[in-house]
Amino acid sequence: MKAVRLRVALTSALAVFLTAATGQALAGAQDGHATAGGVEAKFEYCTTCHGASAQGFRGFFAMPRLAGQQPQYIENQLRAFLERRRVNPVMANVAHGITPDMIPALAARLSALNPPPVGGAPGGDVALGKEIFAHGLPDQNVPACSACHGPDAKGQREIPRIAGQLYWYMVGTLSIWSSERGQGGRPDISWIMRPTVANLTRKQVEALAEYVSALR
C-alpha cells in the first residue's frame, strides 16, 4: 500500500512539474507554427525525461525509447494522448503543450535518431523471447511479433519499432495494456494488441522484453 501511495504521489508531482515546464516550452513556438526553433525546443523538452538522445531512461518510472521510432506511430500516440484515448496523466499534459502542426516535425526529429540500446535487462530466458517474437505461441493464440513489427522489430508506419525498447518499459506496458492502451480502434490500431497481451504470462512478457530490448 505504501508503494502504491508513493507511486501516486510521485506521478502527481511529476505531472505538476511537467505542466509548468510545458507552459514554458510553448514559448519556443512562434504563433503556433512549426518553426525549426519551436520544434527543437520541443525536442529538448522531450529529452528531459526520455534521455539526451531519446534513448529512454531507466528510473522509478521507466521512460520509453523514442529514438528511431516510426514517425506515424509517434504522431498517432501524441494525438491519442491529446484525445484522452491513451491514459497517462503526465503525457496528457505534455501533449497539450504541442501544437498540432508541430507533431509531424517532432515525430520526424525523433525518428531520425539511432543511439544504442540502454541495456541492463536483468537477464532471463532470451531463447523463449526470441521464439515468441519469431513464431508466437500458437497454443496460447499469440501470433508472432515479427508478423507486424517486422523481422528486425523496427515496425512500419503505425506499427511501432520495439527494437531496443527499454526492458522495464516493455514489461510495464505489456502488463497494463488493457487499462492504459487501445481504448477504441480509431484512429490508430493500438487496440489490436489487447487480446494478444492478455494471453501472455508474466514470465513470457519478461522473456520477450529481454529479447527485443537488446535488438539494434
Residue ranges and their predicted role:
Residues 11-21:
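Bacterial N-terminal signal peptides
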